[in-house]
Curated annotation (Swiss-Prot):
Transmembrane segments: none annotated. It comes from Arabidopsis thaliana (Mouse-ear cress). This is Protein LURP-one-related 15. Gene3D superfamilies: LURP1-related. Belongs to the LOR family. GO terms for cellular component: cytosol; plasma membrane. The modification N-acetylmethionine is found at residue 1. It holds the Pfam family LOR. Keywords: Acetylation. It comes from the Eukaryota. Might be related to the phospholipid scramblase and tubby-like superfamily of membrane tethered transcription factors. GO terms for molecular function: protein domain specific binding.
Length: 217
């Protein structure tokens, strides 16, 4: 069975030595916050049409999350499931908006009362990915709670706390023979201490949606 790629820092380096971001903390659920860095390995079977073709594991290969792909006719909705198949969050794209916008809800809900956060492009025309994240209580959206910047195609995106330079998660790509010949896209995401890794996993799903729309445009 294929072993997922996991990015590892040399001992004494990497995010474990970085200060904890002030804007970190719970977005989805406290159980997804750890006092140490979390490395998540992501494998996407790009040619697969089966449910759960987007898989996220921990460093030991244990399943953390999988994505329930939209059925035909419902391409604006995806669900992030935990390892047991229970909905963690539901992601829905709002089709009518000046800037592409995604809403993320708790569990399997799409009720506005269960809105956790909203994501939108920083601008309509972008050479590289720039997304702003607004938590559910941030109604006026004058200042973002998180930012995503980088290149999805190169799998080099970084998540920042608010408008600061404090990094809360970053992505690393891994090229393998299997990724080239078997149509699998392997990369990993390092989540910094005390940052909700279910939240970061759901951002990765949105980044994937953004990229697929850009390629289809």
């Amino acid at each position: 069975m294929e072993q997922p790629y996991v990015y590892a820092y040399p001992q004494g380096s990497g995010p474990s030595g970085a200060p904890t971001p002030q804007a970190g903390g719970v977005v989805v659920d406290p159980k997804y916050c750890a006092p140490y860095p979390i490395d998540m390995a992501i494998v996407r079977k790009m040619m697969s049409l089966t449910d759960g073709n987007f898989v996220i594991t921990d460093v030991n290969g244990n399943l953390l999350f999988k994505v329930k792909e939209p059925v035909f006719g419902l391409h604006d909705k995806r669900v992030l499931l935990d390892g047991s198949g229970t909905p963690v969050v539901t992601l829905r794209e709002k089709m009518v908006s000046m800037h592409d916008r995604w809403q993320v809800f708790r569990g399997g809900s799409t009720d506005q009362r269960d809105l956790l956060y909203t994501v939108k492009r920083s601008s309509m025309l972008q050479l590289k990915t720039k997304l702003d994240v607004f938590l559910g209580h941030n109604k006026d959206e004058k200042r973002c709670d998180f930012r995503v910047k980088g290149s999805w195609l190169e799998r080099s995106c970084v998540v920042y706390a608010g408008e600061s330079d404090a990094i809360v998660a970053q992505m690393h790509r891994k090229h393998t023979v299997q990724s080239v010949f078997l149509g699998k896209d392997n990369f990993s995401v390092t989540v910094y201490p005390n940052v909700d890794y279910a939240f970061i996993a759901s951002l990765v799903v949105i980044l994937d949606d953004v990229n697929r729309e850009d390629r289809a445009a």
